[in-house]
């Protein structure tokens, strides 16, 4: 899919600003999440989606477009909603990490344009209108730099290979293949892991960190994003009140070792009073993580039997018999 203009930054649900630089998977997640959270229902949904995919931020007077734009800006760090200022530092970080994706003079011009933007009230319309002229003037530069150019991104996916979650690959499968590769003695452990057995060894903790960060339950800064967990519960029509209590309890016992936080929260949820709801939500997240655009053309209706069937199919693929 052609990623939409760099202009956007999303707003509803969790709005955890990521830490750059960003790889193609991270930007794909950002753009599709911002689309999902802001697309209108009804006859305008598909035409609007088609434009956003082409980096055309229209209709410009639509609250949906404006909030989509703000969402991307916030998630990438181009706009700080707390300071209510634009910040070009991520542009330089991105160029330093991916120098082949831009020309130095054009990147500097883009960064200067962003840095010169005035303080702006933290609302969708104001942020969108402030950034839109910069987007239009530097669209090609930002599109290339933030992995919106299909051809450039294709080359990066090929270069990174097994070191990045590939398109149409679930993040669970990516992590499983990374830490329990096919043909290795460790592969058999997936038969237990995929049935929610919590292991206590270093390898499993690394694997869990990979998954929990991949589905954004844990941020790059090793912080719990409770809103992301709650979002998945709502996707399977589960009440979040009991979940909130469980997460608060888990938080009170959070380890100081950053490397064990993902494992701690996973174990805490799997062994909690909401474990069945968590497993159901987690399974559905696995299915949806195969296609980040899962809910874009239209919001999908959750079907537990269908998800169970899909997960069993993945089990058969990942767990050697």
From Swiss-Prot:
It comes from the Eukaryota. Lipids and biogenic amines bind independently through different binding pockets, with lipids binding to the N-terminal pocket and biogenic amines to the C-terminal pocket. Leukotriene E4 binds at residues 55, 148, 167. The gene is D7. It comes from Aedes aegypti. Disruption phenotype: Mosquitoes show longer probing times when fed on mouse or chicken but not when using an artificial membrane feeder or mice deficient in leukotrienes. Reduced blood-feeding success, defined as the percentage of engorged mosquitoes after a fixed amount of time, when fed on vertebrate hosts. GO terms for cellular component: extracellular space. Its main location: secreted. Keywords: Allergen, Antiviral protein, Disulfide bond, Hemostasis impairing toxin, Platelet aggregation inhibiting toxin, Secreted, Signal, Toxin, Vasoactive, Vasodilator. Disulfide bonds join 34-71, 67-124, 175-210, 191-319, 250-268. This is Long form salivary protein D7L1. Induction: (Microbial infection) Up-regulated during dengue virus type 2 infection (at protein level).
